């Protein structure tokens, strides 16, 4: 993981107040917040919805249920990592299409533009959520600054 990827974690990209009934509503809310900040192209919303439909990103890890939606860099204006801790869990289809729906308590939207960066980040995130203490620390965060600090410490 490059230091540049860790620098994509910013308090302005951490959301605790997003309410959504499903992944599509979550993407609408993210677009409303990220587009004015200059992170997304007009194609992002349709692209992330289509990618999620074809390649679901819900993960039922031993310590938490999460989702890691992302899309191709061509749909981004600039790189980012957005973190959403929704008011109530959001249902995502399971990665690989096998198993029950995932009730994601945390959604990490990757907007990485570096070649191979998304795969590397997915591996790092899996390491966090396979570890009970790290996962508990991340899930216990209640401020954007705390969330950035927790993730930054594990991803560096």
Predicted regions and their residues:
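Cytosolic covalent-transfer regions centered on His/Cys nucleophiles
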Residues: 1-156
């Amino acid at each position: 993981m490059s230091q540049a990827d860790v620098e994509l974690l910013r308090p302005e990209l951490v959301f605790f107040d997003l309410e959504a009934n499903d992944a599509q509503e979550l993407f609408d809310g993210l677009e409303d917040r990220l587009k004015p900040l200059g992170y997304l192209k007009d194609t992002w919303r349709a692209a992330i919805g289509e990618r999620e439909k074809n390649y679901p990103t819900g993960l039922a890890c031993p310590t938490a249920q999460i989702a890691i939606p992302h899309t191709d860099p061509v749909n981004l204006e600039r790189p980012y990592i957005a973190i959403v801790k929704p008011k109530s869990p959001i249902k995502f289809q399971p990665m690989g299409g096998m198993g029950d729906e995932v009730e994601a308590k945390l959604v990490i939207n990757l907007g990485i533009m570096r070649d191979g960066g998304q795969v590397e980040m997915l591996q790092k995130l899996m390491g966090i959520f396979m570890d009970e203490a790290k996962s508990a620390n991340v899930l216990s965060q209640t401020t954007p600054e705390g969330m950035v600090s927790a993730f930054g410490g594990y991803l560096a």
